[in-house]
A protein has these predicted regions:
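Conserved acidic
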Residues: 2-9, 15, 23-26, 41, ...
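Catalytic phosphate/metal-binding cores of nucleic-acid and nucleotide-processing enzymes, i.e., regions
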Residues: 26, 32-39
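Short, polar loop/linker segments at the starts of domains and inter-domain junctions
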Residues: 44-58
Length: 703
C-alpha cells in the first residue's frame, strides 16, 4: 500500500492512503481503531530489560513518577476511506465525526480506552466534560453537547464502551454540527488475541488478500521517520480487525435472523454475553417481537423480587464451579512409573450447556414450609417442585477415601471438616450428592420450593450444539465461534447481578495519572432474569462433575472409594485422574479424554504442567497452565534447554520460581506494559504440603 504523509501545524502529522481525501472523507458507519505507544523512563526510550532493572524495588507510585506513555499513532480503517493515522487525538476524533462513524471497534479496550482517558481527563480536562442526559431519569442523550463523553465500565476495570460527542464543521456548507461516536471492544465478543483471530477466521480484505498479524519492535520506532514496514504494521492491525468484524457480523446476522448485528447501522451488540442472552430469550419466546418484550415475558413467568434476589445471593445459593487439588499430590511430580499407568485428563463436553439441557425450568412464586411438613409430604412435592433448604447449621466429616470438595463460603476454601453456623441455601439434590462425600448433619430453618416447568433450554442448547459439530465437520470457523459463544455465555446471564458497583475515572492529583474511583452501588431490575434458575444450572453442573469423579475412580473390593488415591485435580468441567473412562466423547455432557500424560505436577489450582510425551528420558511435549502468568513465558524458560528432563521441569516448575512478565500500569500519558517479576506460585503456598513418610521432595518414583 502507498501512503501519503501530511504535516500540519504544532508538529501534527496525518498518514492516509494515496488518493484518499482525509479532509473530506466519505460517509461510513463502522470502523476499526487502534493506538501505538512508546514507553519512556526518565524521559528516555529504553528496552524492557533496562526498564526492569531501573524500576526493581520501586513502589508503584515511584514507578509512575519515572514512567510516561506517548501515543504516537491513533489509527483507524474503513472500506470507504481506507487507512488514516495521526499523532493528535483531536484530529483523530474530528476525522471520525467528518466520516460519520457511529461505531468504532478496538481490540482490548483496557489499553486503547486508557489512552483516551488521559487525553480527555488530564491533557484536555478544561475542554472535555461528562455528558448529561436530557433529565436525571432519562436514557435519552442531549445531542447538543460538544466535547462531552460517557464511559460504560464496571468497578472491576472492564471497559465496554466510550461515547464521545465531537464538534465539527461541515466541509461543504461550513455549518457546525455535533457528532456522537460510540467506541467498543471486539475482544468482549471474541477474545483470544488479534493474531489468533485473524488466523482462525481466515480474514481477507475486499480483494481476497489474506490479512495476518505482522511484527514490529515497539520501542525502536523512530516516530519522526516512520518506515514502510512500520506503517504497514499499523494499517494491517486496524484493517484486519475491520474485516474480521465484518466477516463475523455476517454469521451473527444469519444466525439471529438479522436481530443482532455488530456492523453497520443495526449494530446493537456489545458483548458475547449480551448476544447470548438475546438469542436465548428469542429461542424461549419466538412469538415476542423484540428483546424487551421477551425480558418482560420471562419476568412474568419467573417473578423474582429484588429482595428475593438479594436473599439468595446473601445465603450463597448462587455459586460457581469447583476447582480443587488433591492435597496428597500437591507439589509433587507424579509419574507413570509410580502409578503404573498414565494420568488421563477428561473434559465434559459442554458442561454448562448440558446442565441447561438437563434441568426443568423453575417458574412462578416460591412455596415455603417447615422441614417437618416437607418430609411428611416429600413424595408429593419432590416430583413437581425443585427443593431448596435454608440451613442455619451444617456440620460434616469427610468419608473414608474421599477428598475435600465442600466449599466454605465464609472461609473461602475447600474443607475436610464442615462447621457452618450461618444461613446457607442449597438445593436438596446437591446435599444428596455431598452426602456421598461427607457424613453430614444439618438443621433446616425452612424449605423453599419452586414449581418445575418445561425443558425450556433444550431447543437453544441442542441447536447450537449441532451447529458447533457441523462447523467442526465442515471447517466453518465463524459458525463454530458463534455457537461456542452461545453455549458458553448464556447461562451466566440468567443470574446476572442486579446490584452493580459504579465509579468513574479521574486524574489522580498525587501521580498525574488516571485512576478509577468507586462511587456507589446501583440496583436495576429492568433486565433481571432469575438467580434461582441460574443457581440451579451451576448446582447441577457441580453435582454432575462430582458424580463423574466417583464413577471414574470407583471403589475397592470392600466398597471403599478410591477417589483419594486416583483423583488429582478438578477445574469446572475438567477431571484429572489416574483412571480410565469409556464413553461417547461426542455426546453432549459426556467425558472426552483430552490427554494421556506420562507425568504431571500440580502446585496450585490452575497452575500445573501435564507432560504428554517422553522419549529416552527427554520430555518432548507438555501443556502448561499458570494462573496470573502467561504460559508462553514459562514455556520459553523450558525451551532454553535442548534436553528437557523431568528433573529439570521439577526444579523450574516450582514454588518460589520467578519469571519476567509484563504488567499493565496507568502512567502519565495513558497505560503501558512494564516488565515485572512474578511468582509462578509464592513460596508460602508450599507450607501446607502433605508430606508422606520418606518423600524427599523430588520424585515419587525415586523414594
Amino acid at each position: 500500500m502507498t501512503y501519503e504523509i501530511e504535516k500540519l501545524e504544532n508538529d501534527i502529522y496525518v498518514v492516509f492512503e494515496k488518493g484518499k481525501k482525509w479532509r473530506h472523507p466519505a460517509k461510513a458507519i463502522t470502523a476499526a481503531f487502534d493506538t501505538e505507544t512508546l514507553t519512556y523512563i526518565d524521559g528516555k526510550i529504553k528496552s524492557n530489560r533496562y526498564i526492569f532493572n531501573k524500576l526493581k524495588g520501586c513502589t508503584d507510585n515511584e514507578k509512575r513518577q519515572r514512567l510516561r506513555c506517548d501515543v504516537w499513532a491513533w489509527q483507524c480503517y474503513d472500506e470507504q476511506n481506507g487507512f488514516f493515522m495521526t499523532n493528535n487525538f483531536d484530529t483523530f476524533v474530528t476525522y471520525h465525526a467528518l466520516a460519520g462513524y457511529k461505531h468504532v471497534w478496538c481490540y482490548n479496550a483496557t489499553f486503547d480506552f486508557a489512552q483516551i482517558d488521559y487525553k480527555i481527563l488530564v491533557e484536555s480536562k478544561e475542554k472535555w466534560r461528562q455528558h448529561k442526559r436530557k433529565d436525571e431519569n432519562s436514557k435519552a442523550y442531549n445531542k447538543s453537547q460538544p466535547w462531552t463523553y460517557e464511559s460504560l465500565h464496571n468497578a472491576e476495570g472492564a471497559r465496554y464502551s466510550y461515547k464521545l460527542w465531537i464538534p465539527y464543521r461541515d466541509p461543504v456548507n461550513r455549518h457546525k454540527h455535533v457528532h456522537a461516536c460510540d467506541y467498543r471492544d471486539f475482544m468482549k465478543i471474541l477474545p483470544g488475541g488479534l493474531e489468533r483471530l485473524l488466523s482462525e477466521l481466515d480474514v481477507e480484505d475486499a480483494d481476497g488478500n489474506k490479512i495476518r498479524k505482522l511484527k514490529m519492535d515497539y520501542q525502536n520506532v523512530k516516530v519522526e521517520k516512520l518506515t514502510q514496514d512500520e506503517l504497514n504494521y499499523c494499517c494491517n492491525d486496524v484493517k484486519g480487525l475491520y474485516f474480521a468484524i465484518k466477516k463475523f457480523d455476517k454469521t451473527v446476522k444469519e444466525q439471529t435472523g438479522n436481530e443482532c448485528s455488530i456492523f453497520g447501522n443495526g449494530t446493537n451488540i456489545m458483548t458475547a454475553g449480551g448476544l447470548a442472552k438475546a438469542e436465548l430469550l428469542r429461542s424461549m419466546y419466538p412469538l415476542e417481537k423484540n428483546k424487551r418484550d421477551r425480558v418482560k415475558k420471562y419476568q412474568k413467568d419467573h417473578p423474582v423480587s429484588e429482595a428475593q434476589d438479594k436473599f439468595f445471593r446473601k445465603t450463597y445459593l448462587y455459586r460457581g464451579a469447583i476447582c480443587t487439588l488433591n492435597k496428597k499430590y500437591k507439589g509433587k511430580l507424579l509419574t507413570k512409573k509410580l502409578f503404573k499407568r498414565k494420568m488421563n485428563r477428561y473434559d465434559v463436553n459442554s458442561e454448562y450447556p448440558f446442565a441447561m439441557d438437563s434441568i426443568e425450568d423453575l417458574i412462578g412464586k416460591p412455596l415455603t414450609m417447615t422441614m417437618q411438613y416437607y418430609l411428611a409430604n416429600k413424595k408429593e412435592y419432590k416430583k413437581d417442585y425443585e427443593v431448596i433448604f435454608l440451613c442455619n447449621h451444617i456440620t460434616g466429616f469427610l468419608r473414608d477415601g474421599m477428598i475435600a470438595t465442600w466449599y466454605d463460603c465464609r472461609l473461602k476454601e475447600y474443607v475436610e471438616t464442615i462447621e457452618e453456623d450461618y444461613r446457607h441455601c442449597i438445593f436438596e439434590d446437591e446435599l444428596d450428592e455431598y452426602e456421598k462425600w461427607y457424613d453430614l448433619d444439618y438443621s433446616v430453618e425452612k424449605v423453599i420450593l419452586y414449581k418445575k416447568g418445561q425443558y425450556v433450554f433444550r431447543n437453544f442448547v441442542r441447536n447450537n450444539f449441532e451447529k458447533k459439530n457441523k462447523a467442526k465437520r465442515e471447517n466453518l470457523v465463524a459458525l463454530s465461534k458463534f455457537s461456542k459463544l452461545q453455549l458458553n455465555s448464556s447461562y451466566g446471564k440468567l443470574a446476572e447481578r442486579i446490584e452493580k458497583k459504579t465509579g468513574h475515572y479521574e486524574e489522580n492529583p498525587e501521580t498525574g495519572c488516571v485512576h478509577f474511583v468507586e462511587d456507589e452501588t446501583e440496583t436495576s431490575t429492568s433486565s433481571m432474569l432469575s438467580v434461582v434458575v441460574g443457581s440451579k444450572i451451576t448446582s447441577f453442573a457441580r453435582c454432575y462433575i462430582l458424580s463423574k469423579i466417583r464413577e471414574i475412580c470407583g471403589c475397592d473390593k470392600n466398597g471403599k472409594s478410591l477417589v483419594a488415591e486416583k483423583f488429582v485435580y478438578i477445574d469446572t468441567d475438567s477431571i484429572h485422574a489416574f483412571a480410565d473412562y469409556n464413553g461417547d466423547a461426542f455426546k453432549l455432557g459426556e467425558l472426552k479424554c483430552e490427554a494421556e500424560c506420562e507425568a504431571v505436577k500440580y502446585i496450585m489450582p490452575k497452575t500445573y504442567i501435564d507432560i504428554v510425551s517422553i522419549e529416552n528420558g527427554i520430555v518432548k511435549s507438555y501443556e502448561i497452565h499458570s494462573k496470573g502468568l502467561a504460559t508462553t513465558i514459562v514455556t520459553k524458560k523450558l525451551q532454553q534447554y535442548k534436553k528437557l528432563t523431568l528433573k529439570r521441569i521439577d526444579k523450574i516448575f516450582n514454588y518460589g520460581q520467578k519469571f519476567l512478565t509484563l504488567q499493565a500500569m496507568n502512567v502519565r500519558g495513558g497505560k503501558v506494559l512494564i516488565p515485572v517479576e512474578k511468582y509462578l506460585a509464592r513460596p508460602e503456598c508450599a507450607e501446607d504440603l502433605y508430606l508422606e513418610s520418606g518423600y524427599n521432595g523430588m520424585f515419587l518414583n525415586e523414594r
